[in-house]
Amino acid sequence: MSILNIPCRVALGAAALLAAIAPVSAGGDSERGRTLYESRCIACHSIDTNRVGPLHRGVFGRKAGGVSDYDYSPAVKNSQIVWNETTLDRWLANPERLIPGQKMGYQVSEASDRGDIIAFLKKQMQN
């Protein structure tokens, strides 16, 4: 291997790594996300009111545990996490791994489903 090829290989490797860790919701389908939200999330959550889980309107940029009239677990209240595409993706993939001791007992295993749900939630910021 030529020494001239090393910078190219490093650049390609870095680009591949960045693509692999980019938020999955960047190209999410918000309409499909609405359908997924209505079939998977609505039993516990609502966009505008607290239910078993906290409301979701305004979730982007909000600190985890930040809805004042919802009774969060101490783990969530003390987590210091701020919700964005990456943290929501990690949360939906495995809430207990992100915040041990939290109360949500549901996971979304498919990355494309998480991305679509996140795109739907993000769109609610505009409505």
Model-derived regions: residue spans:
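Bacterial N-terminal signal peptides that target proteins for export
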Residues: 2-12
